[in-house]
């Protein structure tokens, strides 16, 4: 990884926008070698609605927030390249999302999702990095988010026999050592702190086996911005003010 990117991520202060300010400290010649690129991944889309409830669909909320995050980064740092895995209501496979970020040589990947729980009382934000699922509720998140691969006609070939609904698949999953783990953890912690500053309840940073993170060759996180199963949070996420607040916390 170029020194410019390592320097930027290591000295992140309060948010991603603050992180990007660090680019100004790097010599222009070094910056020119590789443009700092942020890929923003709006979860689900098209035939994959994601979680649904309280009058909202995950795919619509994630797209709206993703666009706001990108706009805020561009406004504050026009020198940064901002790309989206999807900018409309279309279906994009999990592997295709990671492949896009890798092909674009992204410096960071931010995957935005909406949570759900059987209990309507569960609420809050949480941000995931690639790691071993230590608790049953963590594994349920991985199964839910990875299940989108089943909507792809050739998923058995694309994902090499990985079954997102099978506990055994996760047990046998070859994690290897994630070279970007520490940077991803640092970024996830910063985002959760920003959520708290915005008045949102933080459920903390968690590790899980999420396909889009496992296939991304850069620091990457998946953030769950709230529970659509909770009426109050659903109302907040569906409102323009709520989406602006959440986007500011991520950006």
Stretches with model-predicted labels:
Residues 3-6, 27, 32:
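Von Willebrand factor
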Residues 3-17:
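Bacterial N-terminal signal peptides that target proteins for export
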Residues 31-34, 216-218:
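Short, flexible loop/turn motifs enriched in small residues
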Residues 15-27:
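Bacterial N-terminal signal peptides
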Residues 168-251:
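Active-site-adjacent mobile loop/cap segments within catalytic or ligand-binding domains
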Residues 2-3, 178:
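Generic amphipathic alpha-helical segments used as scaffolds and interaction surfaces in large
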Residues 32-162, 177-189, 244:
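Catalytic-core regions of hydrolytic enzymes
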């Amino acid at each position: 990884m170029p020194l410019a990117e390592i320097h930027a991520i290591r000295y992140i202060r309060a948010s991603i926008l603050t992180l990007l300010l660090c680019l100004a400290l790097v010599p222009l010649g070094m910056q020119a070698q590789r443009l700092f690129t942020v890929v923003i991944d709006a979860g689900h889309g098209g035939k994959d609605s994601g979680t649904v409830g309280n009058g909202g669909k995950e795919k619509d909320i994630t797209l709206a927030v993703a666009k706001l995050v990108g706009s805020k980064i561009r406004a504050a740092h026009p020198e940064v390249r901002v790309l989206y895995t999807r900018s409309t209501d279309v279906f994009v496979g999990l592997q295709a999302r990671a492949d896009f970020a890798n092909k674009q040589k992204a410096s960071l990947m931010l995957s935005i999702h909406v949570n759900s729980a059987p209990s309507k009382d569960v609420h809050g934000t949480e941000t995931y990095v690639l790691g071993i699922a230590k608790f049953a509720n963590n594994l349920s998140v991985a199964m839910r988010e990875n299940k989108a691969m089943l909507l792809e006609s050739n998923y058995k070939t694309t994902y090499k026999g990985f079954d997102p609904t099978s506990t055994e698949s996760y047990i046998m999953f070859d994690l290897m050592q994630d070279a970007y783990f520490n940077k991803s953890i640092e970024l996830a912690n910063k985002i959760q702190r920003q959520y708290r500053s915005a008045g949102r309840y933080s459920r903390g940073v968690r590790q899980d086996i999420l396909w889009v993170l496992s296939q991304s060759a850069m620091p990457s996180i998946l953030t769950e911005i709230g529970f659509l199963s909770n009426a109050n949070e659903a109302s907040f996420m569906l409102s323009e003010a709520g989406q602006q607040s959440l986007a500011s916390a991520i950006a």
